[in-house]
UniProtKB/Swiss-Prot annotation:
Heterohexamer; disulfide linked. Contains 2 sets of 3 non-identical chains (alpha, beta and gamma). The 2 heterotrimers are in head to head conformation with the N-termini in a small central domain. Keywords: Blood coagulation, Coiled coil, Disulfide bond, Hemostasis, Pyrrolidone carboxylic acid, Secreted. It is found in: Secreted. A long coiled coil structure formed by 3 polypeptide chains connects the central nodule to the C-terminal domains (distal nodules). The long C-terminal ends of the alpha chains fold back, contributing a fourth strand to the coiled coil structure. The keyword Ligase does not apply. GO terms for biological process: blood coagulation. Cleaved by the protease thrombin to yield monomers which, together with fibrinogen beta (FGB) and fibrinogen gamma (FGG), polymerize to form an insoluble fibrin matrix. Fibrin has a major function in hemostasis as one of the primary components of blood clots. This is Fibrinogen alpha chain.
Length: 15
C-alpha cells in the first residue's frame, strides 16, 4: 500500500 504511506507522509491522518 504505497498510497497510505504517501498519505501519512503528507501529514493527513483523518482527511
Amino acid at each position: 500500500q504505497d498510497g497510505k504511506s504517501s498519505f501519512q507522509k503528507e501529514g493527513g491522518g483523518v482527511r
